[in-house]
């Protein structure tokens, strides 16, 4: 079936992913400035692992059909890159997954919390204000680089809400347990790699290999995960620690804790 990806026509066969079609058109790139990270289909963000044409179920003779979003878009697909707001968020989620997976492998019993985004990246607290040494931070960066080079496929899995509650409860992630108890649907979407399971609101890049530009710095009370530069996404942004601004965020979190509303 005929699709148009960034205005270029391509014949999509049943079972072929958007990533396959992007590469077929020669639109993939190692340069983060031009590399497609996800796709916009009818106003929604989709992973490039999305398969736009599949067999119609319930038919005695299988028939290929366009999926709902692609039909609504009349076969038009536009690619999201780092220079777009949605593409930027896709990259950030993917980078964050790599970071959390690395921390889980190196510190399996330690809880890591992403506290807030500020400036060029994300501030994370480790355990009970655990402070990592420079050699320990370098070890985390090496593990992140190993995960990136492994190019692990990132696929979302749908699980039963009760099963997700049981898992996160056993894993000590009580924030997610409290949120899930209010969920009105019986299912829950997670990303899984080996024994690490987590929830992210929104799509990711097709694999961990896409998050190859990052940096990690030790702070007095945690870690700072740095995104690619807006001017040149192929290098990490420069981050200057601002203790007064960090103090404002810390005070805000403390008020949230006192008011019992740390999770929204």
Feature map (PLM): residue ranges:
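Short amphipathic, charge-patterned alpha-helical segments
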Residues: 15-29
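Residue-level detector of alpha-helical segments with a strong bias toward transmembrane helices
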Residues: 17, 107, 212-213
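Active/ligand-binding-proximal structured segments within catalytic/core domains
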Residues: 22, 88-106
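Short helix-capping/linker segments at secondary-structure and domain boundaries
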Residues: 27-31, 106-110
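Auxiliary tRNA-acceptor-end handling modules of aminoacyl-tRNA synthetases
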Residues: 33-42, 48-91, 102, 111-264
């Amino acid at each position: 079936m005929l699709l148009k990806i960034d205005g270029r026509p391509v014949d999509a066969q049943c079972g072929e992913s958007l990533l396959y079609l992007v590469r077929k058109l020669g639109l993939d790139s190692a340069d983060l400035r031009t590399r497609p990270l996800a796709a916009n289909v009818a106003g929604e963000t989709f992973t490039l692992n999305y398969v736009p044409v599949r067999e119609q179920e319930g038919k005695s003779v299988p028939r290929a059909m366009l999926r709902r979003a692609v039909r609504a878009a009349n076969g038009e697909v536009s690619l999201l890159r780092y220079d777009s707001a949605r593409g930027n968020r896709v990259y950030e989620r993917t980078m964050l997954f790599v970071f959390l997976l690395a921390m889980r492998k190196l510190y399996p019993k330690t809880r890591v919390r992403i506290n807030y985004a500020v400036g060029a990246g994300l501030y994370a607290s480790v355990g009970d204000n655990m402070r990592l040494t420079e050699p320990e931070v370098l070890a985390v960066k090496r593990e992140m680089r190993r995960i990136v080079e492994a190019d692990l496929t990132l696929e979302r899995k749908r699980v039963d809400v009760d099963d997700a509650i049981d898992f996160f409860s056993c894993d000590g992630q009580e924030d997610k347990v409290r949120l899930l108890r209010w969920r009105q649907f019986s299912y829950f979407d997670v990303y899984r790699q080996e024994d690490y399971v987590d929830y992210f609101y929104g799509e990711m890049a097709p694999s961990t290999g896409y998050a190859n530009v990052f940096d990690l710095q030790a702070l007095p009370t945690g870690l700072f995960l740095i995104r690619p530069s807006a001017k040149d996404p192929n290098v990490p942004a420069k981050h200057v620690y601002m203790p007064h601004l960090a103090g404002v965020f810390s005070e805000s979190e403390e008020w949230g804790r006192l008011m019992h509303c740390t999770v929204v």
